[in-house]
Amino acid sequence: MPQDIRISPDGRTFFVADMLADGVHVVDGASFKQIGFIPTGTGAHGLYPSRDGKYLYVANRGTNKMMVKKGVARGSVSVIEFATRKVVQTWPIPDGGSPDMGNVSADGKYLWLSGRFDDEVYRINTSSGEVDKIKVGREPHGLAVWPLPGRYSLGHTGNLR
């Protein structure tokens, strides 16, 4: 079940997160044919390119289900290197969690993700993978990161240009 799509920095390849396949389909932009698959983790959901265009962060919810009880999901973030199309790092959410949707900060230092099933938001250091958890209201689904540093909005992911 496709959940998110992003295009490679060179504009030639699509990356499609598939929640039921637990990974990312790689699709040629000219032929629209699948040319690969990258296993990332259970419930691959959101895709977020790094600001330098080297990496693609994949939010793996830790479950394939549409709804789960709080504390059940064991999510992670996979880091795919665009150049090799391989997972180069995986960052588990400590003590479980359900990374869902969000974006990268304007300075590229943090990946912000909603933790839909755990009533929290994750701030993940893109250099170390260190995760900070912030308790928020019930079932945050998406997180828009404004280009102006320090501005965030819970609700749903926005593509800001």
State the predicted function of each range.
Residues 1-161:
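Predominantly soluble domains enriched in secretory-pathway, periplasmic, or organellar proteins
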